[in-house]
C-alpha cells in the first residue's frame, strides 16, 4: 500500500500519470516505392509542422487490403484509396470513412468526381431497361464508367449464370466492343472491335474510342463519362444528334447530364477510422503539406508526383485535397448508384422480382410513427414495409442509400432531400376541392407560414422580437425555421439566433443552447416526436405554456382551439386568445392569415430516389384510395391521414395525395420564392447532411 501511494506521488510529481494525446499520424504505404516517398514526406513535414503539432510516420504493407485492416486495427491511421477500395474500407468490420478527397481541375474549379453516362443516337426508341439485344461500346474491361458502373447496374438483368461475368454480358448484348477482353474466350465482346485491342493506339479504346464505336462502329449505346461527347463534338448541332439514357428509363439531351447519369465516379479519398479523433490531425498534416509541397510549390518534394513511379500515395493528376464533411460516410461519398454497381458485382445477389413489383419501404421517425407504419404495412398486404430513423435527416440519408424508399417532408427538408438527389413524387393536398378536381393546379396550393402570439401580450410585434421566447416546429423546417429565420437574417445579418431570442425551443438546434432551453423532452430538443414541443402542435403548445411567439402553419391555431384538441393544455383555448404578427408591424386575428403571413410555403411532399419514383407513385395512389375516403369513414380501420398523436407520417389535415408531373424537380416544386428564402438562410444552416450532399457539387 505504501509503495502504491509513493508511486502515485512520484507520477504526480513527474506529470507521468496524465494521458498524453498521440499526435502521430501513421500513413500506410503499399509498396517499397510508396514507403520511400512516405519517408521523404515524413522528413519534409518535420520542417514545416509546428513543434507541438502532429507528426507523420510510415507503415509499410503489401496491399490495400492489408492497409485497410491495419488502419481498422489501429496499426496505421490513413491511406488514399480509389472508389472500389473506399467501398471495401467502409464495410463492417473495417468501418473506415473518407476524411479528405483529391480534386482535379484547378483551385477555382475543383472537381471531385465525374459522371458515368450512357449515350445513344437520337431517334432510336429504347430505354435503359431495354438494352438486352442491343450492341454496346465500352471504354475497357474493368474500367469505371465503361464497365463497372453499367454492368453493375445491369447485373440483375443479365442471364444466369452470371459467372464468368464476361460470358453473361456477351449473352445479354447482341455484340460489343470491350477493349482488353479475351477475344478467344468471349468473341462477342470483340464483335465491334476485332481483337479487343487494349492500347490507346486502338481506334475504339477509352472514352473517345467508345464514342467512336457508337458513332462509326455500329454500336447502339456507348458507356463513357459526361465530358466525352463535348470533347469529340464541340458543336452543339452535332451533339444534338445524341441523347442520354437515364436511370428512371427516360432520355435527356446530352447537356443535361447532371439530371441523367448512371453514377457519380468519385475521386480518390483519404480514409481513416471513424470518430477516434485522428481526422483533425490527418487534415492538419494534409493542409500544411498542400501549402508547402502542393502543385508547383516545391522542387525538393512533391505531394502529387514522384520520380520513383506513378501515383504514389496520391494521384499525380490531383491538384489538391479538400476536407470531406463530417457527416459523409463511404456510401454518401460514393453515391447510391456506384455502391449498387459494386455490390451487385461483388456479392452477385439480386432481389426477387423487379422494381415494378417491389414493396415501398417507408421511413418512420420515432416509436409513434413506426407503430403507425407497422399498422399500415399489415393493412397494405405487403405493399408497404417500414424502416426507422432518429431524425428526418437520418431518414433522407437512408432513402439516398437505398435502405428506405420514401417519406413525406415539409419544404425545408424537401430542399435538403433535393440537394441529396431525391425527387418529389406526390404532394399532400389540404384542399378537398382540388382533390376532386386535380387539374385545377399543376401543384396543390401551398399553406401560409405565420407567427402566432398571445392576444394578451399587447406590446409584442414583428419588429420587437429581440429578447423574446420563441417556439419553432424544428430546425430546417419551413414554417418553423426557414421562413421566419430567413426573414430575420435579412434584418439582423447574422446567424446568432440563440442570442437574438432570450430562450426558445427549436428541435434539432445545438444542444445546451438557449434555443433548447424551453424544450421538454423526454429527448430534449430532439428533431422527432420524442421532443414534446416538436412539430406544429408542439410549437403551439410551447407558446401556450412557455413562449412569446410560435412559428407555425396557418391552420395550427384553428386545429387546436375551440375544443378541437381535447388535451389538458389545449381543451380550454379559444381562437380569440391568439393573434398573428404581420410583417408590417401590425396584428390580425388568426382567421386573417391570407393577408397576415410571413410567406406562402409549398405543401409537404413525398420524396424518393429517381429510379423508385414511379413505383412509389403507383403504390401510394392505390394506398390512398384504400385507406382514405374522408373523415367519416375513418373509424375502426387503418386511416392514412389520421394519427394517435399529431401528424404521423403525413399531416393529419391531408385530404389526398396529388401526383406530380413526371420529371418534376425539387426546384420546380418548391418554387423560386421559397428557394430564395432557403438561400437567404443557407449560410446559417447547421445541416450536416446538406453539407455532405453538396460536397461533390461545390
Swiss-Prot record:
Residues involved in hydrogencarbonate 2 binding: 473, 477, 479-480
Record: residues binding hydrogencarbonate 1: 139, 143, 145-146
Positions bound to Fe(3+) 1: 82, 114, 207, 268
Keyword Translocase (UniProt): no
Modified residues (Dimethylated arginine): 42
UniProt KW Lipid metabolism keyword: no
One BP annotation, GO: ERK1 and ERK2 cascade
Post-translational modification Phosphoserine, affected residues: 388, 685
Disulfide bond annotation, renumbered to this chain: 28-67, 38-58, 137-213, 156-350, 177-193, 180-196, 190-198, 246-260, 363-395, 373-386, 420-693, 435-656, 471-542, 495-684, 505-519, 516-525, 582-596, 634-639
Tissues expressing this chain: Expressed by the liver and secreted in plasma.
Name of this protein: Serotransferrin
Annotated organism of origin: Rattus norvegicus
